[in-house]
Design a protein with these regions (language model features):
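N-terminal Rossmann-like NAD(P)+-binding domain of SDR-like oxidoreductases, especially those catalyzing
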Residues: 1-187, 310, 322-325, 332
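C-terminal substrate-binding subdomain of Rossmann-fold SDR/epimerase-dehydratase oxidoreductases
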Residues: 23, 30-31, 55-58, 192-193, ...
Length: 333
């Protein structure tokens, strides 16, 4: 039985990835920080078959200890401070977790595996997946973006992701490690945290439909993103580690939608006119805005056989329906 270790298992992607690996009869271990973390309790309820190990990405010895306990065949590093506005508010911590955290995981794998100058592991090779991000492209010079598109990040989060991405390449080339990065474009789900734009919109539409709120305040509606379903995207992670050779891949739908289109679809689901409820508030606009990101997933389609199954409209409907059910359950409790 294959054994996988997931950092960031309390996240949207972590839970979907764990479910996917369990369906393939993996043994799954989650690396979590803080025994009193309420998100850990949620993981225990959602994923009772997942074993949890405690540690801290800010401490190399802690990461190494977890790797020694779990002895994984595959390690998926999904941990990050991924909310862009939060990365501005806590830029140093973002660098420590999202950037240097990758270094500590790679070093833990290298030390545990006994990889040195010979580039040959003495204890078996751990295959490593790094969750890179389309935010690394930032102020794009070409569209759509491929694996060769230059990086020009415009946020602390994007900059930290570039550091982790390049480190993964460095360890692959310098030590012969099976280390890959998936450059993931925006992917959402009902499990997305409410502070993220997509969930803010779907939750807002649901609250307005149920009479909980009257207005939804948002920033620029013209910004465009390549949005997909998180449950689809985690399949690509496992496929990357199943290849004969380690390579990086862009993962996305190849189709962009504006924030206005997202809003329109969410309010269509609840049969309301968004123009009557949405207010554009300049205070929500980022210090430096990323205008348009669009994936070219040709390589992933060709080499991994990966394609998204859930379309944009279906995704937004899924999220709104989930939020309506959640709010209705809360009101009846």
């Amino acid at each position: 039985m294959m054994r996988a270790m997931i950092t960031g298992i309390t996240s949207q992607d972590g839970s979907y990835l764990a479910e996917h690996l369990l369906s393939k009869e993996y043994e799954v271990c989650g690396f979590v920080h803080g025994k009193a973390n309420p998100r850990v309790d949620r993981v225990r309820r959602l994923l009772p078959d997942v074993r949890l190990v405690h540690g801290d990405l800010l401490d190399l010895s802690s990461v190494l200890s977890a790797v020694e306990q779990v002895q994984p065949d595959e390690l998926y590093n999904l941990a990050a401070i991924s909310h862009v506005p939060t990365s501005w508010e806590h830029a140093e911590l973002t660098g420590e977790v999202t950037g240097l955290g990758v270094l500590r995981v790679l070093e833990a794998i290298r030390v545990y595996s006994g990889i040195g100058g010979s580039r040959t592991p003495t204890r078996g090779q751990i295959r490593f997946y790094q969750a890179s991000s389309s935010e690394m492209f930032g102020d794009v010079r070409e569209s759509p973006q491929t694996e060769q598109t230059p990086f020009h990040p415009r946020t602390p989060y994007g900059s930290a992701k570039v550091y982790g991405h390049l480190l993964t390449q460095n360890y692959r080339e310098s030590y012969g490690m099976f280390a890959v990065s998936g450059i993931m474009f925006n992917h959402e789900s009902p499990r997305r945290s409410p502070e993220f734009l997509s969930r803010k919109v779907t939750l807002g539409a649901a609250k307005i439909k149920l009479g909980r709120e009257r207005q939804l305040r948002l920033g620029r509606l013209s910004a465009r993103r390549d949005w997909g379903f998180a449950g689809d995207y985690v399949r690509s992670m496992q496929l990357m580690l199943a290849q004969d050779e380690p390579q990086d891949y862009v993962v996305g739908t190849g189709v962009t939608h504006s924030v206005e289109e997202l809003v329109d679809q969410a309010f269509r689901v609840v049969e309301l006119d968004w123009h009557e409820h949405v207010i554009c508030d300049t205070s929500f606009i980022r210090p430096i805005e990323v205008n348009q990101l669009c994936a070219d997933p040709t390589k992933a389609r060709r080499e991994l056989g990966w394609r998204p199954k859930v379309g944009f409209d279906e995704l937004i409907e899924m999220m709104v329906d989930s939020d309506l059910a959640l709010l209705s359950t809360e009101s009846s409790a």
